[in-house]
Amino acid sequence: MKSGRFIGVMSGTSLDGVDVVLATIDEHRVAQLASLSWPIPVSLKQAVLDICQGQQLTLSQFGQLDTQLGRLFADAVNALLKEQNLQARDIVAIGCHGQTVWHEPTGVAPHTLQIGDNNQIVARTGITVVGDFRRRDIALGGQGAPLVPAFHHALLAHPTERRMVLNIGGIANLSLLIPGQLVGGYDTGPGNMLMDAWIWRQAGKPYDKDAEWARAGKVILPLLQNMLSDPYFSQPAPKSTGREYFNYGWLERHLRHFPGVDPRDVQATLAELTAVTISEQVLLSGGCERLMVCGGGSRNLLLMARLAALLPGTEVTTTDAVGISGDDMEALAFAWLAWRTLAGLPGNLPSVTGASQETVLGAIFPANP
């Protein structure tokens, strides 16, 4: 069974940077050693946003974007190696999620697409890469997402305490770690995605720092109720979603009914949308004693306060409080999934994704010996 140093690479739906994590992994433990966040050039970020909102590309443009993202991921890995004074031979493998540009797990031909050419990463780092983690689960009738609940269960489950792990990235997803029950998990809906999209369009800021805009505004209840009527929120699990659905166009369609509203009030309403949709799903899933939050949204104190207010009797905390960096959780998970793939172990949970069976995930891109 392969064990040793692994690197995880994650570029999520929030597009706030490439997260790279170094960890020692074996069958008994996952120990994080180092991490960094690598910036995504504005031009690449905009290109990804355009695809996710349905903008058409030529095959040449798509191929160039795939290559550019692969090079970006390789640069991020090499920066971490240099920082830690490590060589390619010191690393067993890289687990690279890739950049999701489309996720459509239902319909006649379900599919999901993550780009960032793994061949570029191997060629530029000299390290074996495991990538393309989601499509095997979809081929077996699953959603292909979320995959991280398996990792949450391995690290954070408790024999008697009802726990849930909430990742608030661009999309928010919930892992249900309830003693005596199969692990559950699904996407609750937008996390930071709509909040970030709104302030980017209105003020040119990548996110609402310290929730300043949201705190300065007031929740527009009719707008909130209008958004909450979206059928996704009442859809039963298993379910997953992404930027191809909850994007700026989705927000614009709802705002058409509310002309002339204060931008700060919209920001406050979007924060409340995230808090309400998450808390409703926690309660519908039977509630928990402890909700452990990770991802960028865990640093949004307004969001954390609203979750605590909407979930009385639940301890709302961060995964950092139990020793796992909330910023690095997903990258760490894909390092762990790479280890499982090389060990020939399944990486999905059918109780989460709806797949017909457990399966080894991913494709292996071997480095030259």
From Swiss-Prot:
Belongs to the anhydro-N-acetylmuramic acid kinase family. Catalyzes the specific phosphorylation of 1,6-anhydro-N-acetylmuramic acid (anhMurNAc) with the simultaneous cleavage of the 1,6-anhydro ring, generating MurNAc-6-P. Is required for the utilization of anhMurNAc either imported from the medium or derived from its own cell wall murein, and thus plays a role in cell wall recycling. One of its GO terms (molecular function) is ATP binding. GO terms for biological process: 1,6-anhydro-N-acetyl-beta-muramic acid catabolic process; amino sugar metabolic process; peptidoglycan turnover. It catalyses: 1,6-anhydro-N-acetyl-beta-muramate + ATP + H2O = N-acetyl-D-muramate 6-phosphate + ADP + H(+). The lineage of its organism: Bacteria, Pseudomonadati, Pseudomonadota, Gammaproteobacteria, Enterobacterales. Its EC number is 2.7.1.170. The gene is anmK. Keywords: ATP-binding, Carbohydrate metabolism, Kinase, Nucleotide-binding, Transferase. Pathway: Amino-sugar metabolism; 1,6-anhydro-N-acetylmuramate degradation; Cell wall biogenesis; peptidoglycan recycling. ATP binds at residues 12-19. InterPro entries: Anhydro_N_Ac-Mur_kinase, ATPase_NBD. This is Anhydro-N-acetylmuramic acid kinase. Transmembrane segments: none annotated. CDD domains: ASKHA_NBD_ANMK. It comes from the Bacteria.
